[in-house]
């Protein structure tokens, strides 16, 4: 054991510091014989088990958080997106053929003369006199 020159022993004022007192650790020299010897805690020790008052009992089969789906109104029946009138005409059996329909975005164009879009007064070409 190596001691520094000028060291005269003496007490240690810190509780956990290891100070030498006559060649013996002050921690072990000052501890009473009746004190329980507890091993030092490790840095990454697991937390102590929870007491029964801290344990929350959940019924089996239920998740921790349940989402509440709240609807202010019942779902309404809406027509399918797209051309509702053409699909209705097709269901009634008016003889529309699928190959005569051309769909551009939400507009359905047809080669049948009755279903061609009419040109408004601004879109008509000027009459040639």
Swiss-Prot record:
Entry-linked InterPro entries: DUF5538
One Pfam entry name: DUF5538
Chain spans, region Disordered: 34-57
UniProt name for this protein: Putative uncharacterized protein C19orf73
Name of the coding gene: C19orf73
